Swiss-Prot record:
Family annotation (Gene3D superfamilies): Cytochrome Bc1 Complex, Chain C
Physiological role: Component of the cytochrome b6-f complex, which mediates electron transfer between photosystem II (PSII) and photosystem I (PSI), cyclic electron flow around PSI, and state transitions.
Entry's family note: Belongs to the cytochrome b family. PetB subfamily.
Note: Heme 1 (or BH or b566) is high-potential and absorbs at about 566 nm, and heme 2 (or BL or b562) is low-potential and absorbs at about 562 nm.
Gene Ontology molecular functions: electron transporter, transferring electrons within cytochrome b6/f complex of photosystem II activity; metal ion binding; oxidoreductase activity
Main location as per UniProt: plastid
UniProt: heme c binding residues: C35
Organism name: Calycanthus floridus var. glaucus (Eastern sweetshrub)
UniProt topology in membrane: Multi-pass membrane protein
PANTHER family on file: CYTOCHROME B
Note describing how the cofactor binds: Binds 2 heme b groups non-covalently with two histidine residues as axial ligands. Binds one heme group covalently by a single cysteine link with no axial amino acid ligand. This heme was named heme ci.
Name of the featured protein: Cytochrome b6
Length: 215
């Protein structure tokens, strides 16, 4: 086993990378509130794992979506647990994200030279809220249906572009299969991909610039 490790070490310098990661200086003023971003990331990873598991059973059609969710909750092995963890983690992720944004703002973490870190963080906050909006509709029950109808109808008040924007969100003039398909695609592919991209921008900047000093 050591020979295998030595082979990789010789080519990739794994130990040097590990030392750089584990030897980063942590300021003495850091406390539990500085862990909120990491907790948000942990919730996101739980969401990815449990969401991926549910895609094996969920059917994104207006006729089968609700029945497939019922199947997950009542018949699939540990389906009730996986979906429950997904829901609890979603609520926790939103809460931790809000607290994290407040902590960064109140401690001045958005100031120079961390403006771009703040911007990417705000984008991640918007993406987190978008996860909630799109995921809420996927069971396609009465609550989900009317939530989608209300949310997608909001842009209609915008002059000129309101109606085309509503049709773009819904996929047609009314809420239906096209809407569910779009929300499912957003929730399971587009939003996770964008979140991963902005996280890959967000974390290296934190790593490079370090944690902001105390007030």
């Amino acid at each position: 086993m050591s020979k295998v490790y030595d082979w990789f070490e010789e080519r990739l310098e794994i130990q040097a990378i590990a030392d750089d990661i584990t030897s980063k200086y942590v300021p003495p003023h850091v406390n539990i509130f500085h862990c909120l971003g990491g907790i948000t990331l942990t919730c996101f990873l739980v969401q990815v794992a449990t969401g991926f598991a549910m895609t094996f059973y969920y059917r994104p059609t207006v006729t089968e979506a609700f029945a497939s969710v019922q199947y997950i909750m009542t018949e699939a092995n540990f389906g009730w647990l996986i979906r429950s963890v997904h829901r609890w983690s979603a609520s926790m992720m939103v809460l931790m994200m809000i607290l994290h944004v407040f902590r960064v703002y109140l401690t001045g973490g958005f100031k120079k030279p961390r403006e771009l870190t703040w911007v990417t963080g705000v984008v991640l906050a918007v993406l987190t809220a978008s996860f909630g909006v799109t995921g809420y509709s996927l069971p396609w029950d009465q609550i989900g249906y009317w939530a989608v109808k209300i949310v997608t109808g909001v842009p209609e008040a915008i002059p000129v572009i309101g109606s085309p924007l509503v049709e773009l969100l819904r996929g047609s003039a009314s809420v239906g299969q096209s809407t569910l398909t779009r929300f499912y695609s957003l929730h399971t592919f587009v939003l996770p991909l964008l979140t991963a991209v902005f996280m890959l921008m967000h974390f290296p900047m934190i790593r490079k610039q370090g944690i902001s000093g105390p007030l």
